[in-house]
Curated annotation (Swiss-Prot):
Originating organism: Bartonella henselae (strain ATCC 49882 / DSM 28221 / CCUG 30454 / Houston 1) (Rochalimaea henselae)
Presence of the UniProt keyword Iron in the record: no
Disordered: region residues: 267-288
Free-text function comment from the UniProt entry: The type IV secretion system VirB/VirD4 is a major virulence determinant for subversion of human endothelial cell (HEC) function. VirB-dependent changes of HEC include massive cytoskeletal rearrangements, a pro-inflammatory activation by nuclear factor NF-kappa-B, inhibition of early and late events of apoptosis, leading to an increased cell survival, and, at high infection doses, a cytostatic or cytotoxic effect, which interferes with a potent VirB-independent mitogenic activity. These changes of HEC require the T4S coupling protein VirD4 and at least one of the effector proteins BepA-G.
Name of the molecule in the record: Type IV secretion system protein virB9
Record keywords, A-Z: Periplasm, Signal, Transport, Virulence
Length: 288
């Protein structure tokens, strides 16, 4: 019975020791496939990266392109020479001495900072491939890569949506119903070859290499204002309809009047603001 209790007690002590004793381990960079002197490590601000330097050789640390080294602290400046340069740091061991540490702080373009912790070891011997030699240690940033991928996918999705909308717009612009009831008064030098609208946008077509004049929308109170527009070849698509537009180029002025203007932007054929919605009039109930 005493032997069993003693065994259980020793097992309990061993378990408590394993549970309460902290473990410390530095992160060793992973070797590149082609040459083990080139190494990679994922960034973690709470990991210590192990660096092994060889006498008569140097080690290059490479951080993200948007980082710049702003502070370097080293435990043993006698055994190691440190030279920061942009988002790089160059290390050169001078003599074999006990393990020391290196701390680096970088600033990013967005104003945030990153902190790096290193354990530095020095060894003598051959620096050829196959030995425990470090020439370049490049940091990787999985979270940044994931964010960049997410933003790129979002940008592609937005572009696809924009292309889809533009395709619909172009189809409606090219083949949809049009209002051609426009008149012009003023200088013939800046007169467009044609003007029409589809109930939402107004298209001005100019001949050949004609210098396109400025196009102003004239409000109901007579005020002129520039409006958003899209230029496609010799066409200027104004993103609005109006009772009157004024074209100006130098001293030349031309007024364009829409004889069928409807302030609500009614489609000239369907009677609504959408080519897919047909307006119907119900007689006898007081509504239409």
């Amino acid at each position: 019975m005493m032997r069993i209790l003693k065994t259980l007690f020793l097992a309990f002590i061993a378990a408590i020791s394993c549970y309460t004793t902290p473990s410390f381990a530095e992160t060793a960079p992973v070797s590149a496939r082609k040459d083990n002197r080139i190494r990679f490590v994922n960034y973690d601000p709470y990991n210590v990266t192990k660096i092994i330097g060889s006498i008569r050789s140097s080690v290059q640390l490479e951080f993200a392109d948007d980082e710049e080294v702003t502070y370097v602290g080293i435990g043993n400046s006698v055994a190691w020479q440190v030279a920061p340069a942009g988002h790089f740091v160059f290390l050169k061991p001078r003599e074999v001495q006990p393990v020391t540490n290196l701390q680096i702080v970088t600033s990013r373009q967005d104003g945030t900072k990153r902190s790096y912790q290193f354990e530095l070891q020095v060894r003598e011997g051959d620096v050829s491939a196959g030995n425990d030699t470090y020439f370049l240690v490049k940091f990787r940033y999985p979270e940044d890569e994931a964010l960049r991928k997410k933003l790129a996918e979002a940008a592609k999705a937005a572009q696809r949506e924009e292309n889809f909308v533009n395709d619909i717009f172009n189809t409606h612009e090219d083949f949809g119903p049009r209002n051609w009831a426009y008149e012009a008064q003023g200088s013939p030098l800046i007169e467009p070859a044609s003007v029409y609208d589809n109930g939402k946008t107004t298209t001005f077509t100019f001949l050949g290499n004609t210098e396109i004049p400025a196009i102003y929308l004239v409000s109901l109170d007579g005020q002129e204002a520039l409006v958003p527009k899209t230029i496609k070849g010799n066409k200027v698509i104004v993103h609005a309809t109006a009772a009157q537009f004024t074209l100006r180029r130098g001293n030349d002025v031309l007024c364009i009047f829409n004889k069928r203007f409807v302030p609500a932007g009614v489609n000239p054929e369907t009677g609504t603001t959408s080519p897919s919605v047909q307006r119907k009039v119900n007689i006898g109930n007081g509504y239409e």
